Regions:
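ATP-binding N-lobe of GHMP and related small-molecule kinases
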Residues: 1-99, 117, 121-126, 163, ...
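Solvent-exposed alpha-helices and their adjacent loops that cap or buttress functional pockets
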Residues: 35, 133-134, 140-143, 159-164, ...
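Short, basic/glycine-rich phosphate-binding loops at helix/coil junctions
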Residues: 49-62, 111, 206-217
Length: 285
């Protein structure tokens, strides 16, 4: 038996635009996405000689084929015609669930990377990302990591320059958001403001953190805020403490802000933790 270890890194959406619904039921998106240092830890036992098994240290996480990490292992082994003679996947969760931070997708991507490394890396990172699209829309980006423009339903990736040095503070309120319901609301409403992805890309190319902050925007944010005024309260706290930018990530419900240094982030984190238990400090990676 062999044990594999891999980190599963969360993501944030610096921008997120919904361009329209496709014939296959998915939506075309355009988003600048960023990997951050908040991570789950994945351990995989290969060759257990037993039925497949998944364990997680957090309650409420499915521990069967519904879990994207399990699905990723199945997709990889089927595609590469590998018989591992039993797999046990163990997930130590730190990425909050139902936050818009890609926790399940990050776990799936980590499984794909670990299995590919175990079998001698027969697939390039690009090919592995393509395989990840069979598992979930955010999985291709979570395979590649870094900073990227993500399009289509998540399968089209273009690497961008690294995020300028900064610190993220992320706050996850208690409520969660139904992603299917959110897309339904987006389909039924007229999107007013949209992110300027070209401006965001130019800011990254210039390494200009101030302009990056000026162009952070997520079309889902006002839709979710209309139903959950608590998001405005969190953002008012961030504004009060002078955060350079603040925005919901993905389909929510986590809100992040961008600051220039760890000391500033620690002050904001301490303030938020007076009301919210799930607050994280992270770096772009």
């Amino acid at each position: 038996m062999t044990t594999l270890y891999e980190g599963a890194f969360a993501k944030l959406n610096l921008t997120l635009d919904v361009l329209g619904k496709r014939e296959d039921g998915y939506h075309d998106l355009q988003s600048v996405m960023q990997t951050i240092s908040v991570r789950d830890d994945i351990e995989i036992d290969i060759g257990t000689g037993k039925p497949w098994c998944l364990k997680c240290d957090k309650e409420g996480i499915p521990c069967d084929e519904r879990n994207l990490a399990w699905k990723a292992a199945k997709v990889y082994c089927d595609a590469m015609k590998k018989d591992p003679d039993g797999i046990e996947i163990r997930i130590t969760k730190r990425i909050p669930s139902e936050a818009g931070m890609g926790g399940g997708s990050a776990d799936a991507a980590a499984v794909l990377r670990a299995l590919n490394r175990h079998y001698g890396e027969p697939l390039s990172i690009g090919a592995l990302a393509e395989l990840g699209a069979q598992v979930g829309s955010d999985v291709p980006f979570c395979v590649v990591c870094g900073t990227a423009m993500v399009e289509g339903r998540g399968e089209k990736l273009r690497k961008l320059p690294d995020m300028p040095d900064c610190i993220f503070v992320i706050c996850k309120p208690e409520f969660s958001v139904s992603t299917p319901e959110l897309y339904k609301k987006i389909d039924e409403c007229t999107i007013g403001k949209r992110p300027d992805n070209r401006a965001m890309e130019s800011a990254l190319l210039a390494g200009d953190l101030e302009k990056v902050c000026q162009n952070v925007y997520n079309v889902f944010d006002p839709v979710v805020t209309a139903d959950h005024a608590e998001l405005n309260y969190i953002k008012s706290l961030l504004h009060q403490y002078g955060a350079a930018a603040y925005q919901m990530t993905g389909s929510g419900s986590a809100v992040y802000c961008i600051v220039e240094n760890f000391e500033y982030a620690a002050v904001i984190c301490s303030m938020l933790r007076e009301n919210y238990p799930q607050v994280f400090i992270a770096k772009p990676i």
